[in-house]
Regions:
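Short helix-capping/linker segments at secondary-structure and domain boundaries
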Residues: 62-65, 169-177
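Accessory, usually C-terminal, subdomains that scaffold auxiliary metal cofactors
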Residues: 174-217
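Non-catalytic ligand/cofactor/substrate-binding and regulatory segments of enzyme domains
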Residues: 3-154, 199-202, 206-219
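Charged/polar, solvent-exposed surface patches and flexible loops
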Residues: 133-141, 166, 187, 191, ...
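Active-site nucleophilic cysteine motif
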Residues: 52, 149-171
Length: 219
């Protein structure tokens, strides 16, 4: 009985939540650039332009509450934001300068600056304590590919959505049904899934037990 209560308490303390934020929320220049980008892509693909979304995660685990997000490097105080990795923006050469680098945050008691503008959020993806902790453990392992390029041959550019989908797929969360709010698009999402599944295939080749692969969902 006590063991059952303990498991129940752990589940109440644990969750993985997904937030969808309009691209450039709170930043007018980023939003304008996003609108221009989507207008061009939509024209090339001969479709209606969609709203673009950036994703972030909030993870509750027995070890605490954490914000998982990719964001521009603000200063040299990354440790205060739980930064576990950095990557280049645009090109590896440009990444020598802070303004052209992004940071990967695993921020204890952190904040998502634009959370008030989140749409159809939060989405509860899991209340499994082991999944929550596994996701936290995986954050330092996320690829730090060049933001905005398809450096990993995944079929689309790597960005903040790639970070989110990579972590969810590697954690074992069912990503098949995940998609941005109605009428929206999350560029980079499929790239994270593709790269994460390569890891699973490689693990399977070494004889590890892995989840079966499934077809890519349209995001």
């Amino acid at each position: 009985m006590e063991r059952r209560r303990a498991r129940s308490t752990l589940r109440q303390m644990s969750s993985i939540e997904l937030y969808w934020l309009p691209l450039g929320a709170g930043g007018h220049s980023v939003r304008l650039n996003g609108l221009v980008f989507e207008a061009v892509v939509a024209r090339v693909e001969r479709r209606t332009a969609c709203d673009l979304y950036h994703s972030a995660l909030v993870v509750h685990a027995p070890s605490g509450r954490f914000v998982i997000e990719q964001a521009p490097v603000r200063d040299n105080q990354g440790a205060k934001r739980g930064v576990v990795a950095e990557g280049p923006v645009g090109s590896r050469l440009a990444g020598r300068f802070r303004i052209f680098r992004y940071e990967v945050r695993r921020w204890r008691n952190g904040v998502i600056p634009d959370i008030a503008e989140a749409v159809a959020s939060p989405q509860l993806l899991s209340d499994d304590p082991s999944q929550a902790q596994r996701l936290l453990d995986l954050v330092p392992e996320v690829p730090t590919a060049v933001w905005g390029l398809d450096e990993l041959d995944a079929g689309e550019m790597w960005n903040s959505n790639s970070l989110t989908s990579w972590l969810l797929e590697r954690t074992g969360v069912d990503t098949d049904t995940l998609q941005p709010p109605l009428g929206g698009r999350a560029p980079g999402w499929d790239a994270g899934l593709v790269v994460a599944r390569r890891v699973s295939v490689a693990a399977g080749a070494r004889g590890r037990v892995i989840r079966p692969e499934h077809p890519l969902g349209v995001v």
